[in-house]
Amino acid sequence: MLPPRKLAAVHASYYVVTGAWAIVDRRSFEAVTGPKRDYWLVRLVGALAVAVGASLGSAVAAGERRRDDTTLALATTLAFVAADVHAARSASRVYLGDVVVHAFFVPAWLRPWK
C-alpha cells in the first residue's frame, strides 16, 4: 500500500479528475454511469468534487494535515459511499466499484503522514 500522504494525493486527484470528467464530457460519463435526467445536478456534484479535491490536494502539497482536512476527506467519502450505494440499487452497478475505491482511501486520513 502507498504511504498515507501519497495515498491522500491520489485521493485528491481522484476527486479532481472524476469531478471534472462529469462536467467536461457528459457522453462518456453517462456511457459509464448510465443516463441522467437532471444533468445540472451531476455538474454540481462534479464541481463540488473538484473543490474538495483541490482542498485536500492543498493539504498534501503543504505536507500538513489538519483535523479539518481529515474531517473533510472522511465526510466526503462517506457522502459519496452513501450516494453510490443508493445509485447501485436503482441505476448502474458501476457505483459499487466507486465504493471500493473510496474504502481504499480511508487509511490515508487515519494513519500518520511521515
Stretches found by the model and what they are:
Residues M1-K114:
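Short amphipathic, positively biased membrane-proximal segments
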